Amino acid sequence: MRFDDPMDEFKRNRKMEEDSKKVIDVKVAESDKGFAKFGKAEVPFHIPTLTKPQEEYKILVDNANNPFEHVLLEKSEDGLRFIHPLEELSVMDFVDRNLSEMRPVKPLPLEETPFKLVEEVKDLEDLAAALQSVEEFAVDLEHNQYRTFQGLTCLMQISTRTEDYIVDIFKLWDHIGPYLRELFKDPKKKKVIHGADRDIIWLQRDFGIYVCNLFDTGQASRVLKLERNSLEFLLKHYCGVAANKEYQKADWRIRPLPDVMKRYAREDTHYLLYIYDVMRMELHTMAKEDEQSDSPLVEVYKRSYDVCMQLYEKELWTRDSYLHVYGVQTGNLNAVQLSIVAGLCEWRDRIARADDESTGYVLPNKTLFDIAKEMPIVVAQLRRLLKSKLPYLERNFDAVISVIRRSMQNAAAFEPVVQSLKDRRPETVVEMNIEPKIEKTDTGASASSLSLEKVCVDDSKKQSSGFGVLPLKRKLESDKTVVEKNIEPKIEKTGTEASASSLSSKKVCVDDSKKQSSGFGVLLSKRKFESDNKVKEEVKVSKSKPDKVIIVVDDDDDDDDDESYEQSTKAADALDRVSETPSKGSPSLTQKPKTCNTEVIVLDDDDDSESREDEDMRRRSEKHRRFMNMKRGFLNI
């Protein structure tokens, strides 16, 4: 009966915790509760003035465009794959036994725990000896991805039940593997890591370390179905520690490490073994989902086993690598632009490998796409595109311009790729309906049963500029999507009381299959519905012919050239002439556009009993349409 006491005590503690909404009591000194007293993070994401550790500490890296060789692993008989040490072991070899006898070991307060900064080989030797004498230890790594091509481990934190260690990786780079490799591989020693997916492959890549017998607290939190899976949440939930995560993305290459960063690094592992204890108890008492499934504890070890079985693979450049750059698949690029993207991706990959920099540091994706869309062919144009300091681009302006020009000449080869990208995009429909909005100016007015059918625009080609969202139903090039939105037309009364009822118009289709070269795209909207481009729609209804609706669209985009302005003004003048003599007592049919960026769509209903005025309006509207078609034809030449 004595052996059941710890488990019974654990269950009672957890029940009390659930009832009182409190965590298990862990004595934590006031100074341990996060970093609040240290203020905001003083170390930014990137410190450009730092000497690269690869250069300062003579760290050798292999960025050649060849597969990564796991030189310490044996190969399969066919020579096609590497054999991980875990393949000789079973998950069940690591599952805890006799948990009913176990008590969670509460951690000492951070200030009372011995701490060692490992910077010399002798210190590393002492650490290895200390790990030989324990059954489990917690591990975490700090990493830098921005100033190196493959990534660079910057710091290793290790905690036992009694002591915390921080290993200065840079100073001991060539010694980490020889001293720690066998300890991480030892299946009898439990390694506790939170969210180990990346840590596992970083250890393989930089030090040839392969982990066996892992308990991943991140996987455990998922099996336990906790509210959140982050280490920050676990520290608060189980230990009452409010961890400050502002240093999570700090530049960990900095040396010497500030005290506040040392403290942050220690917190990542200091409490982890206690969290591991409590989680095991919870998993042990947790019911299985069904009879066929594994126990929750076994499930965590299976997931942890799978995490360890990952093998690092180097990123290789291929002819199609540019297609995997974020934004290419949905960027709606034409053949010339896509060719430039491919050329610049290859250029930055070559530079990044040679100088051991990330491709994002050499040429960020946003700048890459800006260049591809603007297609600068002289240095002055390229320089104007830069929004921030990019050293590699600034040192290689001429080379980049050469890449752009060469890519533009090779654009024809990318036509099939552009078509393939379009074909892959799913087609969706979003509807856009019109509901009338009635405004009174002098006397009351009413409107009912106003319905306008969909106006279809095929926007299957790129537009370089144009008006805001005018088409009520249209295809968006970016994702081969038909979008329909709700538009509320404004019905305005300017004279005596009038009413609009049963107003309807038929479907009007506009072919926007050609590229627009200026802002006078009239019916042609931008490919995306953007919140910052607010489109104003005004609908005015004629009393004499209430089934004619003129929609005036005003886009506040004033980036158009002088030619567009002149042509737009002519169109506005033509519109004025269409309706300069409205019938007596009827509301004004038009309103002079507020800016040059306006257009009119006349939606007609076939009616044989038209009045002379309506017939005149139809003829004038037809002239307007012909003018529009002529303009489109001019732009398509």
From Swiss-Prot:
Output compositional bias ranges, type Polar residues: 580-598
Domain of life, source organism: Eukaryota
Q: Which stretches does UniProt call biased (Acidic residues)?
A: 553-565, 602-614
Name a single GO cellular component. Answer: nucleoplasm
- What GO terms in the biological process aspect are recorded for it? exonucleolytic trimming to generate mature 3'-end of 5.8S rRNA from tricistronic rRNA transcript (SSU-rRNA, 5.8S rRNA, LSU-rRNA); gene silencing by siRNA-directed DNA methylation
Report a single Gene Ontology molecular function. nucleic acid binding
Result of knocking out the encoding gene: No visible phenotype under normal growth conditions. The double mutants rrp6l1 and rrp6l2 have a late flowering phenotype.
Q: Which UniProt keywords apply?
A: Nucleus, RNA-mediated gene silencing
* Pfam families reported for this sequence: DNA_pol_A_exo1, HRDC
HRDC domain residues: 334-414
Any idea what this protein is called? Protein RRP6-like 1
Q: Which organism is it from?
A: Arabidopsis thaliana
Q: Which gene encodes it?
A: RRP6L1
